[in-house]
Amino acid sequence: MWNCYIEHASTSRMEDAIEYLVGENKKRQFFDLYRKNYITEKDVKYISDNNFNALRVPLHYRDFSPNFMEFSTEGFELLDSLVAWGNRYNVYLILDMHAAPGAQNTSDFSDSEINGDSELFTSYTNQRWLASTWKHIANYYKSEPVIAGFDLLNEPARPGVATTLRNIYEQCIDSIRAVDQNHMVIIEGNWYGNDHTGLFPPFDPNIVYSFHHYVGGINDTMTMYNQYRNGIALQYNVPLWVGEFGENSNTWANGIKEFFNRNDIGWSWWNFKSVERISSLFSYKITNEYQKLINYWGGNGIKPDTAEAFAGLISMAKSLHFDSCKVNIGLTRALSDTSFSSKSKSFSNFIAPGLLPAVNYDTGNNDVAYYDNQSEDPNKF
């Protein structure tokens, strides 16, 4: 997202790095614009217009509970616009706890501490904090039908915590059910979503089992998910949902998606919007002003003054807006067009005479719209 190197570039580290350059007030101004522009009504309309029906929305616990047993409405102020747009365009929202108190893994996206510990599993206070935060969220949205469900914990990962992970989920579900009996609860396995040891049999009547999938070709995926389907969905009569898959070619995306659809497995592509990527629906460019910050953070440039740093941040936030982004049409069609695997389509309308960019080749699967001797990377990670 930031396209720069800062050691363990978690949310907190990035906030500290930005505040160091521009101060607290300008940091807040930047993040306000960043959040406002990252997803807008135009984004949601595009999603709906292209036959997608849900958005998985990553949350940080601090936006709802900045301190233990202290609750905030800041997160709802951000989400309520999404809820309104979701209702307007028939797009469901899945709320996903991407960063939990103490962190649920050692990765930057969980906002773990610099020592890389996942202290959600070692602190009962953090576990109670997570459960109370979910109760706060569930109570606020208990009667909102556009909220499809609550993804309780994104990609937990720590050795030897099968029993603890189940206890955490049970605490969260008990807290949610005290105020909300309507919404689905979604649980991911250990080791970044895929090890569900100790999480059976189901312990809520409205539970969904979720996985994440990035590694493996189409044939490998079919073998793996047939095992999941037979061993989980059919045995326990519960739905499966792939909360993340992505970071690969359009042909790979289409093949995996079609397999999931044939087997009644719900899915969500990751990521929605990224910096200069062809593997997200939207891509935004690095501005010249923001590049100076990247150079500085990467050790390849001088420290910008406050005005220069703030200008770089604001230019980055503006580039996030729908009107400034590039739409990755090929990926959009790979995920939404049912004829993608069998029929090529023009990238866009062209009226001669004029300039026809060579990169605007027809969209469609490999061997349908084009030929590439390596149209997927099964060992992406």
Residue ranges and their predicted role:
Residues 128-274, 279-291:
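Extracellular glycoside hydrolase catalytic/binding regions
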Residues 1-36, 204, 210, 215, ...:
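Glycan-binding loop/region signatures in secreted carbohydrate-active enzymes
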Residues 62-71, 254-265, 346-347:
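C-terminal/domain-terminus segments
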Residues 41-44, 81, 175, 221, ...:
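Coil residues (strongly favoring Ser/Thr
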Residues 327-381:
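Extracytoplasmic
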Residues 1-184, 189-196:
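Active-site mouth of glycoside hydrolases
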Residues 266-349:
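Extended, alpha-helix-rich binding/interface surfaces that flank or overlap catalytic cores
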Residues 2-13, 224-227, 369-381:
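Short, polar loop/linker segments at the starts of domains and inter-domain junctions
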